Amino acid sequence: MKITFLGATRTVTGSCYLLEVGGHKFLVDCGMFQGSKLIKALNEKEFLFHPGEIEAVVLTHAHVDHSGLLPKLVKEGFRGPIYCTKSTEELCSILLPDSAHIQEGEAEYANRKGMRAGKKIVEPLFTVDDAARALHLFKLRSFGEAFNVVPGVTVTFRVAGHILGSAFVEMSVTEGDKKTRLIFTGDIGQPNQPIIEDPAVAGGADFIITESTYGNRIHEAYDKEGELANIINDTVERGGNVIIPAFAVGRTQVLLYYFQKLQAEGKIPEIPIYVDSPMANRATQITMTNPEEYDEEARALYAMQGRRLVSMHNLRFTATVQESMAINEIPGSKIVISASGMADAGRILHHLKHNLWREDSSIVFAGYQAEGTIGRRLIEGIKRIKIMGEDIRVNAKIYNMKGFSAHADKQQLLAWYSSMKEVPKAFFVTHGELDAAMELADSLGRNLGTATYIPHFGDCAEIHGTEWQMHESEMVQVEPAAIDLRAYMRGMEHDYLLQRSKIEQIVARNPDKAVMVRKKLEKLHKYMDDILKDL
């Protein structure tokens, strides 16, 4: 058996694993790269396999960094089944067509500009028709149901507790007289999240392909409901708006659950709450109609409210672009939840444009912000940012509420692995930026006394029973993190030129500041030298 790592290697997005067993090929996940423009460009590269030779896909959950390239896979010849849970299929039915609309729109925009410059016509990465054909291939399997993927390979989905429908994959592989047990974690949720059940206890495996999104972090143990209430109350007192970039699937529904609870307890005022994302609207409806995946508390609330999980008179779902734009014309404080969660596309850009410059407004991030995204730049303290072609000063208060993460942290992952009956032979650490992957790998080695490996793009693990060896990729492939660093440094160069011009203008008006500015720049220069010495 061979496992080739074709995404989420030393980065968080693009999950894709190619498995070869007894002459049969199948994938676990087929995700899209997300982040900066240079990282997104990896989606344009050819697959390192022939899609027509892939016999099946096992899909852990609906998030596009795990499912987003399925339409491209179908476009290029894949015709096999895509196995997933019921809720995952329902969520993909909104996520994949939406992603296809974006691809078509970006291609149309590029072609309008390109025609004037005489450039070659750009084809979309995939189309809405490709997404529809991909969805037609989905085959539903229940949690706990064992099924065959290809000869010799049996898979069972277990509750991952990340988002609705999310699963980790228990896999049994038989080759001749050799048997191997594998676990692909997908994304493991942190315990005690609202609405959905906690991750199930895994039965054990010889090898685990693990995520490491928060492999170097411990979620803060604090009263996040109280903090959310404080932010809302402070913002309302200032007369501003609370703008929340939120993932349409999972995070939006959790936030609504909390707002309902805080309102019922009288801890926040009943100001208008807008969910301004057609995708989030549909995802909320899907969440409402799958109570079998709720935890005990959510089931009780669902029954008490007449088979409705969320019921607030001040909650509004906007559908049209006109309704979305009208929100910013409505006087008074309001809460706006909009996508995308990393603020790099979608209607949220419109709300950021209208609120970032306002000192009375608050921007609340309640999820992971990948390198290169607008969300990441805002939580890192950027003072000016370009949104929708307009240079905007950041005056609003920026909050980064990490406690809402749908990913388990390092301690929670270690506790989950420790609950297994036996220690695996090795962990392959993926789906995390390099520092996170390295820290989790180190902790796994020290705490469990097992081997760990952090694959590069294209690396291949060859496994025979419980024996394994790695074959490092000979491909010339730049790591996504390195691509993103290059883009970030280009941004630094651009900012430096602007800053230099401003400094020269300031000193021209105030020559007495020249000495002070020189001393500060000398300190900065020395700091940069020290950074290079540490590398």
List PLM regions with ranges.
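Core dinuclear metal-dependent hydrolase active-site scaffold
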Residues: 1-52, 133-197, 322, 326-329, ...
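Cap/insert and terminal regions of metallo-dependent hydrolase folds
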Residues: 168, 191-276, 362-365, 385-454, ...
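Hard-cation-handling environments
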Residues: 231-373, 382-386, 421, 436-438, ...
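A polyampholytic, Gly/Pro-enriched intrinsically disordered region
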Residues: 103-108, 291-305, 386, 469-493
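Active-site-proximal loop/helix segments of hydrolase catalytic cores
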Residues: 161-166, 172-175, 179-205, 212, ...
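Metallo-beta-lactamase
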Residues: 99-163, 291-330
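Pre-active-site segment of Zn-dependent metallo-hydrolases
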Residues: 9-11, 21-80, 84-134, 188-197, ...
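Active-site metal-binding loops of divalent metal-dependent hydrolases
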Residues: 8-9, 30-33, 87, 163, ...
